[in-house]
């Protein structure tokens, strides 16, 4: 689109087959950081643009979201989101217990002190979204090569020269963007560059189908007091929980394919046992709820919770896009645009 020259995308696996395939993909619009809201809005704009360009639907599920507060601390957080949403023009309203129960048939509404409903929030299938990005990029002239693992970034005299693939093939380029997610630092270490993030396990559980109790496309929820989120899933309920001590991983132990990596799945019931009591006041039978599936994967968390996007000072032509802090699907469109503008020397949006 920006006439930036020849662009090549290299993916070590099939597109959308790794971390993005293990995400809940909540496109939450309201954030306490204004810049992050801009990035998320750009993703929504990208989805609309891609659908128009390809003349096909990416099946965005405009289900809305409900943020729930049941303590003084979570109420302050809710109020901050409410203020941010109003400032950014995002539709929102506080709803009472009766309306909460109507929208969320599974919830114990008496546990809800305050509920903030944002009807334009959505979720999306990451495979469809990533496939949409790829198809649109190809249509606009980008060359895509999947199953091409990058072995090293080539530099000479503090300037990027390209990359070398695992096959030994050298690909020359004056600009290299390291967007390798959890694997990004493996490519940076030989260059004596460290990106300030750590791969941390994120996970969720999916219940058995009960379409009456968990109707399709009911609003997803964010429940800070339970360190939890929920999302509909074809008649089941996705339950995401954050344990008190999150498990991080040495990136050098990561396998080339995440399906071959052990995210300590043996601990999934231990984690559920630890976190379930916090959610029980909202989902009373969580102890007995049939669980059909468990999903885990890495999220790249940064100490200051800010994304790592832009040029690497040590090497001319080297850029990075990583450290998405669990928000890569939601903010991906904005992250891509910001990276492109920085590479081209344009004023960031």
Question: Where do the protein language model's features map onto the residues?
Answer:
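Glycine-rich phosphate/pyrophosphate-binding beta-alpha loops
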Residues: 26, 32, 121-126, 225-227, ...
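C-terminal lid/capping helical subdomain adjacent to the catalytic/cofactor pocket in oxidative enzymes
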Residues: 94, 313-349
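Central helical "cap/lid" subdomain
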Residues: 168-219, 346
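Active-site lid/adjacent beta-loop-alpha segment flanking the redox-cofactor pocket in flavoenzymes
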Residues: 211-317
